[in-house]
Design a protein with these regions (language model features):
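Adenine nucleotide-associated cytosolic modules
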Residues: 1-3, 7-198
């Protein structure tokens, strides 16, 4: 049950999951239609939360969460007019298309994003934008600017950089690393100051 080409098949899957539970049919239908989806930013956030709890448990200084963690983002789902818009096509973006639809994925690919800073948060943002396919169409682009150079102390928290990148431009190095992750991404890098504090 890896793809759901018709409304009928996702309805059947929703009924199969329901069993004897008292669950809203809309919730089950949303689950059945999107359970094959994969969203890199959500996986990164959940993975980060899980890793933090493991460190708490192993370190013994802080108490980890000792309960189920439930994450619900149904409000982010678009209304479903057609299942055809959410069919898998064998693309690297199928995990996103299954959840949000082909039209949304096309808008992501045509987006033009200006990102100030290629530090810790900038590296994470660039990775997420590349995984989502932002700036992959001829009209789309990611522009990243950062005046800084990579220092050895950056390597532990800015994961796009390696030891041999020390002394290099953060913007250029981050752009190269992102293009290795997703060669279709159009990235321009600048080394200009944006504001008084940037």
């Amino acid at each position: 049950l890896h793809s759901f080409p018709t409304r009928r098949s996702s309805d059947l899957m929703a009924e199969a999951f329901r069993g004897d539970l008292e669950v809203s049919p809309a919730v089950l239908r949303n689950f059945a239609q999107t359970c094959c989806g994969e969203l890199g930013p959500v996986a990164a956030a959940m993975g980060g939360a899980a890793a933090q709890e493991v460190l708490k448990a192993c370190g013994g200084k802080f108490a980890p969460i000792r309960q189920f963690l439930y994450y619900d983002a149904f409000e982010a789902l678009p209304p479903r007019e057609s299942h055809e818009d959410c069919r898998e096509e064998g693309s690297r973006y199928d995990g996103i298309t299954v959840v949000f639809g082909r039209e949304f994925q096309q808008r992501l690919s045509e987006s033009r994003v200006f990102l100030v800073g290629a530090g810790a948060i900038g590296c994470e943002m660039l990775k997420n934008l590349a995984l989502l396919g932002v700036g992959t169409s001829p009209r789309g682009k990611i522009i990243v600017t950062d005046m800084d150079r990579i220092e050895r102390s950056n390597l532990s928290r800015q994961f796009l950089f390696r030891g041999n990148d020390v002394g290099q431009s953060k913007a250029r190095t981050a752009a190269r690393a992102v293009q290795k992750m997703n060669p279709a991404v159009h990235v321009d890098c600048w080394e200009v100051k944006v504001g008084q504090f940037a």
